[in-house]
Amino acid sequence: HSGYDWLLVDCQHGPMEPVTMSAMLCAIQNGGAKSMVRVAGYDDRNGIQQALDLGADGILIPYINTAEEAAAGVSCCLYPFGKAGTRSVYFPQRSMNKQGLLGYAGGNNDNVLIALQVETADCIKNMEAICAVPRVDLLFLGQNDLCVSMGLFDGKYDFPAMYTSPELEAATAKLIKCATEKDILLGMFQFGTDRVTEFLDKGFNFISVGNDLHHVLTQSFAHKEALV
């Protein structure tokens, strides 16, 4: 109810199990926002299935390195209509609501948002091939892991200088170019709003500005400073 367009439920780093995820997805829908679930990886078929069956509007697949991995992850998100994917059909399930099996499954392939996380040097290297995979809807830049993968945080740059390094700028530019050529949306993680305008101007329109712990800590520190 705070006005965010979308919220991410993190099953990669967060201590999450299906019952908790289900409750969070219900709360997000009730608040009027859209939901995206980050799963463990492209081969987390069960995690992708559970998230979509429980009503996730989108799936974020981390640690993509190759077009083959991208295609495998996409396949798990889509029902096999027209051989589009390999998602299992089950009835009834929460995500169907009142639509019924055909009402939900028949249109879900067009409605689910499939996002791949760009966070490795190999992903940047293979970006053209990854962007050519059908039904990659969104490419989500993960700067932390990408900097580590590129060797930028191993004594080369101090934190947070790695975020403005020429190497990361070049990788980001390649991501933007390849995604734009294929009409793929761009997203990214940010902690705070200092650089949001900069990345909006670069074409990123799907931006996270923090997680729950970040929000709690930021507001807690602000209250403390206001009282001393």
Residue ranges and their predicted role:
Residues 1-228:
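Expand to "…catalyze enediolate/carbanion chemistry for C-C bond making/breaking, isomerization
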